[in-house]
């Protein structure tokens, strides 16, 4: 996306900087100071050594969250075919996480680091966002490693081309209808903020699952720990930026929020069809067709607690047109 945004060519140093009045968030300061103790990149860089316990009889992905797990045609498939689907869904899960980091979260962080929004030149905001960017690079590495090791251990020699990340497709559609650069910047910021406040719900689906490969749970647990902090950072940063936006920018942010929430929650049925076909499951089209007609069958993420907190912090409870569901028991935001 950078090539579409020439205004990012100048670094923040070229403009100087100033501590913004009112940006002294105790929460943000605490999160910045905790980074050396919390960040996976600092404390778990030797993750490559954790693969010794891989057991080929243990599934790669939780059957419980497979949306077609109880479909008669899936149950009628051979055990090795069902296992191949679970492995493919684990690889696809990692691919989705990587794409979310690279296409959604990092471009939003880049806008903040380049001082695009009033208040984003503040040193505390810059430091917190830069720490998050370092984290995201390591997360991408962890999930790339997960894909490579799974391919090696499961002896998978090929994978069909995958569809573009559905969340990003929805963002590009929104950007195409926005003639003004400032409005496109707001949309990118909102998509990134939603990703960073909701991705922990996606990670929690696997992080606390005891039925899958221990290494898969470890990777998602480490990522979840970082993203829990990122969610809090993003809430604080967006609140500070929103307070300094003009009315046009604020209205654009409110318009984008529900669209971004729906986009992040969406289950890409075309990706599921690819996994079923790759495993040779008979009736793959019928399985996906039945899923499409099922209530909730097209929704992957069902926990929006982090995004809901952001909306509340912005004072937009009544302005954002989105039906937030009840927080599920497995939510990372549920007190333990």
Curated annotation (Swiss-Prot):
Its cofactor is Fe(2+). Involved in the biosynthesis of the polyketide antibiotic aureothin. Catalyzes the oxidation of p-aminobenzoate (pABA) to p-nitrobenzoate (pNBA), an unusual polyketide synthase starter unit. Reaction mechanism involves the generation of a peroxodiiron(III/III) intermediate, which effects the initial oxidation of p-aminobenzoate to p-hydroxylaminobenzoate (Ar-NHOH). Ar-NHOH is then probably directly converted to the fully oxidized p-nitrobenzoate via a four-electron N-oxidation, bypassing the formation of a nitroso compound. Fe cation 1 binds at residues 101, 136, 139, 223. Contains a nonheme dinuclear iron cluster that stabilizes a peroxo intermediate. Was originally suggested to contain a binuclear manganese cluster or a heterodinuclear manganese/iron cluster. Its EC number is 1.14.99.68. Fe cation 2 binds at residues 136, 196, 227, 230. Belongs to the AurF N-oxygenase family. It catalyses: 4-aminobenzoate + AH2 + 2 O2 = 4-nitrobenzoate + A + 2 H2O. Pathway: Antibiotic biosynthesis. Disruption phenotype: Deletion of the gene abolishes both N-oxidation activity and aureothin production. Homodimer. 4-nitrobenzoate binds at residues 93, 200. This is 4-aminobenzoate N-oxygenase. Changing residue 227 to A: Loss of activity. Changing residue 196 to A: Loss of activity. Keywords: Iron, Manganese, Metal-binding, Oxidoreductase. The lineage of its organism: Bacteria, Bacillati, Actinomycetota, Actinomycetes, Kitasatosporales. Changing residue 135 to A: Loss of activity. GO terms for molecular function: identical protein binding; metal ion binding; oxidoreductase activity.
